[in-house]
């Protein structure tokens, strides 16, 4: 009997991608995988439920995939992820197209749920409460480029920012054991991974729950010992939780990219307080200055929310001044999304959508000018570039200054470049967010 074919659509962030990779790793031994939904007997949609735009995309994708039940081979539609965890039975009632629903802690049940359905048991699985589940990544099927993989070091969040639903979806902060992280990293390296990207809802507080103190610096130190790993990149660092030992480890460890993602969200003390952030403008700027002083050529990325309830013109102007004067290397901007079940959703002084959008565009225009200025100063410099693909004209890769998907890239000319290899590249031209360079002779490895 031919194996059933399983297809998956993974939505949302890189943490969701890891969840999808875990599920694919589990089902690949029992079923045949396909990227073509027209061929799939079973379709899994791993949803995002963080903000309104993501929720709508998830719902639309489920409905799109449900059409293959009548037009093609699909016999079973499974919804997983944050949207299912957040809405549970309510989602099942609203979307009868879903045959099986699994929450963010139920991925170990994926094969059992599929088999039960095949055997005639049509009971819809319910989402499990996060407190019943420990962190265990298991075998993953990596979906990124061969040389790069995300490595989750913790799950959940204890920060409870007033705009954020994640603690209710993903649960309390739980660190993985260091031994588990290192073991998975070694397996990734054996399979050709050269860049590890450390992720969690909050990477900087790693270890505080299981070791009694922050241990991210120790994670970096141990991962750097693994043969084959060349770059270690850290995302989702809360600035108020960055500590001296971590800064020192980044500065002295050659394998740790001089790159940090600091999701500050805003700079006005008024807005930070309403957001429930545990820091101030002065502390954020102080931390940025510390990092720039102690880590040579560090690249700093942040994400910002504009249009938060009560954000006055003065607050917004303060944010604009911050963009113009501090000149962070990379900035992502989001308009505030009013999420039911969060304290911010019932705050007074909600901002009109038109104002939010205008503020988003204004910040991005300012950051575009900053980015152009920063990139122009890179012309003539040489970088180690990890080559990821060839588009027919250029090789495309990234330097240590660029995380995949969220930052720019380097278009590389010249002979000798190879996919999944590092090449020394000299920058010849600066674009708004990207760079153009040429391979230095005999430089690829």
UniProtKB/Swiss-Prot annotation:
Primary location: cytoplasm
Record EC number: 2.8.4.4
Pfam families linked to this entry: Radical_SAM, TRAM_2, UPF0004
GO cellular component: a single term: cytosol
Cofactor(s) needed by this chain: [4Fe-4S] cluster
Radical SAM core domain ranges (all copies): 143-373
Keywords linked to the UniProt accession: 4Fe-4S, Cytoplasm, Iron, Iron-sulfur, Metal-binding, S-adenosyl-L-methionine, Transferase
Chain positions recorded as [4Fe-4S] cluster 2 binding sites: 157, 161, 164
Catalytic activity entry: L-aspartate(89)-[ribosomal protein uS12]-hydrogen + (sulfur carrier)-SH + AH2 + 2 S-adenosyl-L-methionine = 3-methylsulfanyl-L-aspartate(89)-[ribosomal protein uS12]-hydrogen + (sulfur carrier)-H + 5'-deoxyadenosine + L-methionine + A + S-adenosyl-L-homocysteine + 2 H(+)
Note describing how the cofactor binds: Binds 2 [4Fe-4S] clusters. One cluster is coordinated with 3 cysteines and an exchangeable S-adenosyl-L-methionine.
Domain TRAM: 376-441
Residue ranges constituting the MTTase N-terminal domain according to the UniProt record: 4-119
SMART domains referenced in this protein's UniProt entry, alphabetically: Elp3 (SM00729)
Binding site for [4Fe-4S] cluster 1: 13, 48, 82
PROSITE patterns: MTTASE_N, MTTASE_RADICAL, RADICAL_SAM
NCBIfam families found in the cross-reference section: 30S ribosomal protein S12 methylthiotransferase RimO, MiaB/RimO family radical SAM methylthiotransferase
Protein family membership: Belongs to the methylthiotransferase family. RimO subfamily.
The name this protein goes by in its record: Ribosomal protein uS12 methylthiotransferase RimO
Native source organism of the sequence: Clostridium perfringens (strain 13 / Type A)
Gene name in the database record: rimO
């Amino acid at each position: 009997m031919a194996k059933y074919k399983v297809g998956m659509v993974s939505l949302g962030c890189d943490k969701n991608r890891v969840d999808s990779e875990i599920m694919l790793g589990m089902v690949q031994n029992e079923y045949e995988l396909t990227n073509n939904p027209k061929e799939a007997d079973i379709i899994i949609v791993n949803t995002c439920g963080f903000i309104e735009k993501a929720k709508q995309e998830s719902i639309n994708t489920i409905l799109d995939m449900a059409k293959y039940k009548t037009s093609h081979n699909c016999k079973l539609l499974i919804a997983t992820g944050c949207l299912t965890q957040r809405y549970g039975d309510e989602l099942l009632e609203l979307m009868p197209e879903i045959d099986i629903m699994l929450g963010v802690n139920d991925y170990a049940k994926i094969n059992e749920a599929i088999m039960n359905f095949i055997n005639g048991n049509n009971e819809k699985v319910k989402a499990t409460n996060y407190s019943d589940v420990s962190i265990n990544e298991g075998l993953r099927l990596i979906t990124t480029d061969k040389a790069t993989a995300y490595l989750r070091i913790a799950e959940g969040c204890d920060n409870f920012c007033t705009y954020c639903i994640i603690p209710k979806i993903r649960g309390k902060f739980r660190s993985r054991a260091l031994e588990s992280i290192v073991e998975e990293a070694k397996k990734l390296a054996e399979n050709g991974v050269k860049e590890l990207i450390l992720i969690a809802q909050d990477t900087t507080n790693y270890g505080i729950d299981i070791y009694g103190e922050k241990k991210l610096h120790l994670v970096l130190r141990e991962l750097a010992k693994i043969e084959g790993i060349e770059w270690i990149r850290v995302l989702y660092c809360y600035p108020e939780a960055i500590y001296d030992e971590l800064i020192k480890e980044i500065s002295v460890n050659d394998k740790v990219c001089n790159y940090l993602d600091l999701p500050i969200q805003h700079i006005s003390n008024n807005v930070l307080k309403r957001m429930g952030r545990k820091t101030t403008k002065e502390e954020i700027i102080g931390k940025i200055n510390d990092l720039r002083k102690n880590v040579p050529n560090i690249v700093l990325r942040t994400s910002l929310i504009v249009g938060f309830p009560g954000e006055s013109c003065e607050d917004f102007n303060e944010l604009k001044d911050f963009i113009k004067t501090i000149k962070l290397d990379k900035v992502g901007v989001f308009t505030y999304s009013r999420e039911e079940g969060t304290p911010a959703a019932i705050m007074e002084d909600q901002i009109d959508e038109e104002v939010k959008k205008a503020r988003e565009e204004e910040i991005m225009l300012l950051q575009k000018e900053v980015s152009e200025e920063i990139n122009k100063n890179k012309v003539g410099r040489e970088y180690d570039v990890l080559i990821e693909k060839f588009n027919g004209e250029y090789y495309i890769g990234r330097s240590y200054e660029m995380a995949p998907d969220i930052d720019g890239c380097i278009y590389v000319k010249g002979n000798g470049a190879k996919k999944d290899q590092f090449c020394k590249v000299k920058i010849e031209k600066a674009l708004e967010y990207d760079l153009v360079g040429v391979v230095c002779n005999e430089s690829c490895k």
